[in-house]
UniProtKB/Swiss-Prot annotation:
Membership in a protein family: Belongs to the glycosyltransferase group 1 family. Glycosyltransferase 4 subfamily.
Gene encoding the protein: Glt1d1
Organism ancestry: Eukaryota, Metazoa, Chordata, Craniata, Vertebrata
GO cellular component, one term: extracellular region
Paired cysteines (S-S): none
One MF annotation (Gene Ontology) recorded for this entry: glycosyltransferase activity
PANTHER family: GLYCOSYLTRANSFERASE 1 DOMAIN-CONTAINING PROTEIN 1 (PTHR46660:SF2), PTHR46660
Subcellular location: Secreted
Name of the protein in its database record: Glycosyltransferase 1 domain-containing protein 1
Length: 346
């Protein structure tokens, strides 16, 4: 089939990485996939022109509100994938919730990353019960074997021996919902007591106003660094070399960065929110914190307890291998897309 795939494609964001991986799954099944950024279109009529020009037969959208609403009212069948924003933010706005309800009426299937997301969606839109499937994110990491960690540290203005460093890494697009400043003050205090601990924030500048605020705060914060986005292979190499991966988001659908860190055998410290607690079991596959002070306590414990670190890393790797199989994700999407083929034949 000739498929249209709409997603938010800001480079080096979780959405773009997920969309690229899912496109690969669909193309591996023999489909031709036209991947487009939902933000490039303002109305369904622009999509209608694209469908006609490209002779598209079916469609998929990552995010119901940002992408799915643009697929309504055309003659082609489509499926949708819930993003964290759909359920954590947009569902709280009456008009957006109504729009997403109409999208679900027309969609042939919908995918949620977790059982909790599915449950939330079914409460919000009871009429969609029966067409929502759960498929967690499939994870495959490919760290750049030639990446130079010492050069990265120098570029980050961290002038200490790599042997005795503890780098806590936050990977996120710079926007308020990711809350990268949540831990900055507490961490900076800790760094002044313990100069070999650093926090490095890596990610694209998504929100220009918020980015200025982040840069200003980080510039004044001892032991905290801000690094521009980088390609996936280099980012995986950074994760593999750091001491721990940190997630301080206000809300998440399912953080690929957390799962990638687990796959790379790096301990995870995550803010205790539903999206994170769905994949991190406290003390088993990672550590969950509810405030900056608790984060510092847990980080200090992790630094001083190699046995805990080893246990968390072992369990995290096993969890990802068992529950976030790239192959299972591929099989699921290739099977679901056949629902759109069936509709073409009807």
């Amino acid at each position: 089939m000739r498929l249209l795939f709409l997603a938010v494609l800001r480079p080096h964001t979780g959405n773009a990485v997920t969309a690229g991986r899912l496109r690969d799954h669909l193309e591996a099944a023999g489909h031709m996939c036209v991947l487009r950024d939902a933000f490039d279109f303002e109305s369904p009529s622009e999509i209608a022109n694209l469908i006609m020009d490209e002779n598209l037969e079916a469609a998929l959208a990552l995010h119901l509100y940002r992408g799915g609403r643009l697929l309504q009212g055309h003659s082609i069948p489509f499926g949708v994938i819930f993003g964290g924003t759909d359920l954590n933010e947009d569902a709280n706005h009456k008009e957006k919730k109504e729009v997403m309800g109409k999208v679900l009426e027309e969609a042939r299937f919908a995918v949620a990353f977790t059982e909790a997301m599915k449950d939330t969606a079914q409460v919000q839109w009871p009429h969609a019960t029966g067409k929502i499937f759960v498929q967690s994110q499939g994870i495959a990491t490919i760290p750049n074997a030639n990446f130079n960690w010492n050069t990265f540290l120098q570029q980050s203005e961290i002038d200490q021996s790599a042997d005795n460093l503890y780098i806590f890494l936050i990977i996120c697009g710079l926007r308020p919902v990711k809350d990268p400043l949540y831990l900055v003050d507490a961490f900076s205090e800790w760094h002044q007591e313990t100069p070999n601990v650093y926090m490095v924030i890596v990610g694209p500048e998504v929100d220009p106003v918020f980015t200025r605020e982040v840069k200003e705060r980080v510039r004044r914060a001892a032991g905290v660094r801000l690094i521009r986005e980088m390609c996936q292979e280099d980012l995986h190499a950074v994760v593999k070399s750091c001491f721990a991966l940190v997630n301080s988001s206000v809300s998440e659908g399912m953080s690929a960065a957390i799962l990638e860190a687990m796959d790379l055998e790096v301990p995870v410290l995550a803010r205790n929110i539903p999206g994170n607690s769905a994949v991190v079991e406290h003390g088993v596959t990672g550590l969950l914190f509810s405030n900056p002070q608790e984060f510092i306590q847990l980080a200090k414990r992790l630094v001083s307890d190699p046995a805990l670190e080893k246990e968390i890393v072992t369990n995290g790797r096993e969890y990802v291998r068992t529950h976030h199989s790239w192959q299972v994700e591929r099989d699921t999407y290739q099977r679901l897309i056949r629902k759109l083929e069936t509709n073409l034949e009807d």
